[in-house]
Amino acid sequence: MSAINSIAASPTERLPGPLVFTLAAGAGLSVASIYYSQPMLDIIGKQFNVGVGAVGMVPMLTQMGYALGILLLAPLGDRHDRRVIILIKGLLLVAALLLCGFSGGLNALLIASFATGLTATVAQDIVPASAALAPERSRGKTVGTVMTGLLVGILLSRVVSGVVAEYFGWRAMYWLAAALVLFISLALWRVLPRFTPGTSVSYPRLLLSLAHLWQHHQTLRRAALAQGLLSVGFSAFWSTLALMLSDRFHLDSAVAGAFGLAGAAGAMSAPLAGSIADRIGPARVTLVGAGLVTISFALMFLLPALPLPAQLALIVLSTIGFDLGVQATLVAHQTLVYSLAPEARSRLNALLFTVVFIGMATGAALGSLALARWGWNGVVTLATLAGAASFALRLASRHLKN
């Protein structure tokens, strides 16, 4: 029996730190692939000589591919060896990223971006794999560490892509990403044991069970819709930030990517939000989080009244606020959803994140449209209304429950 199998079979030991780190790195590098384009949109648009609305389709189709991949591919982890799935999807993600880097025009980049989103859902296979490997007594800590890796991947993706695109070109970012994903995919194949499938149910029946879970659990529907609305504002902001900073402040993609550092508070708040949800209840955390998101976006209506340095400071402050609110609300919604049917957590997770990334795709599309037609105030209005709608939904859910 290998060392990994021995440790995974023991209920009293923790997984080795290097294994947990590899899982966290795999989740982070995989999900980062769907965010690299955002700080580079201005550079890509200029190279292909297309407008804001057209280049905004890149993040939209990436998010759409991710949402579809979660819905159609994530359930396969219940039926097949996750080790094999992680390797295959990782190699397909490498191919998609290379296609992005070698795209000769916008249409080719759009197709490759959709494929990138579809295959980047390997991150949603790595997180359940970590839960399956970890002994029960340390499972929460292990999954939390892997989720932190995923969130840090989202955060650093914008910072790294902004810098790489500015100094080496946007294509170099995709080539670098492909190399990193190839390395971590092979590393995961080497360290992971084989997984015994949890069910022999056919693939069509797995998909049908998703519909049953969605129809049966009202709490799931409300949580998914509320988080999806927050994702609309979140994605609208990040999908248009680089374009706005270039137009209004004449800042390059490296600076736009550096704004991702302001999201560190959001990434680091995930464990804290979970602890608070345990003490005061996840429903209250969702209300506070949605309210914080709404207020943070609304503050940016003050930008025209401020001098330029103060405008940048306010954008940073708002970014910290809404990122914190979005991540805290997500953790609380996961707590609500996972308690509904423990035996179906993978599928519940797939449904929740499908709606989240539909919101991401919608926000990217509407954000680009709003920026092109109404400027930055249009983006701020869209994001604020989406946050307010999420807050109203959580408030209504609480009143109905009472």
Regions found by a protein language model. Name each.
Residues 5-14, 192-225:
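Juxtamembrane intracellular "pre-TM" segments in multi-pass secondary transporters
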Residues 68-106:
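Conserved MFS/SLC helix-loop-helix module at the cytosolic interface between two early adjacent transmembrane helices
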Residues 108, 138, 145-192:
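Helix-loop-helix hairpin linking two adjacent transmembrane segments in secondary transporters
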Residues 112-150:
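Cytoplasmic helix-loop-helix junction between adjacent transmembrane helices
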Residues 122-134, 326-341:
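Intracellular juxtamembrane helix-capping segments at the cytosolic ends
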